[in-house]
Amino acid sequence: MSAIAPITGSLKKRIMKDIAVGMGLGTVLGSYWWWGFHKPKIAARENYYTQLAEQKAAEE
């Protein structure tokens, strides 16, 4: 019997931790991009084209 117990399962724990951290960060950053950048840009574009259509309808 050795004085120090062997380290078992460390690779599996490391892989699971890496996957969990990667999925968590990916979800958080993806959500930030979607709600913080993409949605406001799309809303601004939609507002622009709505105003443009209203102006065109008013001219006719």
UniProtKB/Swiss-Prot annotation:
The pathway is:
Energy metabolism; oxidative phosphorylation
Q: Which UniProt keywords apply?
A: Membrane, Mitochondrion, Mitochondrion inner membrane, Oxidoreductase, Transmembrane, Transmembrane helix
Segments on the Mitochondrial intermembrane face: 38-57
Instruction: Cite a single GO MF annotation.
Output: oxidoreductase activity
Q: Does the keyword Transferase apply?
A: no
Q: Name one GO cellular component term.
A: mitochondrial inner membrane
Removed propeptide positions: 58-60
Cellular localisation: Mitochondrion inner membrane
Q: How does it sit in the membrane?
A: Single-pass membrane protein
Q: Which CDD domains match?
A: CcO_VIIa_fungal
Mitochondrial matrix side residue ranges read 1-18
What are the TM regions of this chain, as residue ranges?
Answer: 19-37
Q: What is its main location?
A: mitochondrion
The annotated subunit structure for this chain is:
Component of the cytochrome c oxidase (complex IV, CIV), a multisubunit enzyme composed of a catalytic core of 3 subunits and several supernumerary subunits. The complex exists as a monomer or a dimer and forms supercomplexes (SCs) in the inner mitochondrial membrane with ubiquinol-cytochrome c oxidoreductase (cytochrome b-c1 complex, complex III, CIII).
Belongs to which family? Answer: Belongs to the fungal cytochrome c oxidase subunit 7a family.
Give the function comment from the record: Component of the cytochrome c oxidase, the last enzyme in the mitochondrial electron transport chain which drives oxidative phosphorylation. The respiratory chain contains 3 multisubunit complexes succinate dehydrogenase (complex II, CII), ubiquinol-cytochrome c oxidoreductase (cytochrome b-c1 complex, complex III, CIII) and cytochrome c oxidase (complex IV, CIV), that cooperate to transfer electrons derived from NADH and succinate to molecular oxygen, creating an electrochemical gradient over the inner membrane that drives transmembrane transport and the ATP synthase.
* Name of protein: Cytochrome c oxidase subunit 9, mitochondrial
Organism name: Eremothecium gossypii (strain ATCC 10895 / CBS 109.51 / FGSC 9923 / NRRL Y-1056)
